[in-house]
Amino acid sequence: MVAAAKKRHTGGGKDMTLQYTALGDSLTVGVGAGLFEPGFVQRYKRKMEEDLNECVSLLVFAKSGLETSDILAMLNEPFIMEQVKKADVITITGCGNDLLQSLEIYEKEKDEHVFLEASSHCQKNYSGMLEKIGDIKGDKDTRYLVRLLNLYNPFPSIELADKWISGFNRHLKQLESAPQIKVIDTYAVFKGHEQEYLSIDRVHPNSRGYEAMAENLRAAGYGLLKS
């Protein structure tokens, strides 16, 4: 999906349109928001436009059911690489489907090592995504943002799921090695608000949940983009 924004120029001819490229799974798609309701991506785009007083061009590369390995693989596609290179802001959601698959296997085998394997797999793929983005951007381009949304727990009654998600989120936080990169604490946003923020499927956010996610992204600030 491509949402075009009209380009504005300063007197010196500098392009003042910001590009936002969103990568991910069903959360980036906006599943659960309701008919004609935007997910967090479109809401965050609007908040950026308000906060920065700039037009924002949006490109979304996402599909329900994608695992982190699929999202990493997308970064090898020439058109997506081009849009990542141009992007001022990049958001990534992932690992939710890896979690769901792990839960299904655990219910059959009762072996919690399946969660550790999934966590290690997700961490490796997220590291690969950031490395690939860095390669695409090159050393000279540092004026951009990458926002990684960590996992919330849609299954608060499953103690092992919460333990696994919390552990994964701690490891994800360690990827904030560069000033452009921030991990957004979606877990804290949903903790204790599952009834309020989850859709009828009890897995994906509803409209209020996506709004809370967008506000959390906004609260992370805009770094060098605001200078």
Protein language model annotation of sequence segments:
Residues 41-48, 75-76, 127-135:
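Short, well-ordered amphipathic alpha-helices
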Residues 65-76:
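Structural motif
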Residues 27, 65-67, 153, 190:
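Residue-level detector of flexible, active-site-proximal loop/helix-junction positions
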Residues 32-36, 73, 158-162:
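Short, solvent-exposed loop/turn segments at secondary-structure boundaries
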Residues 79-207, 211, 215-226:
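Alpha-helical cap/lid subdomain in secreted, periplasmic
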Residues 2-64, 81:
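Serine-esterase "nucleophile elbow" of acetyl-processing enzymes
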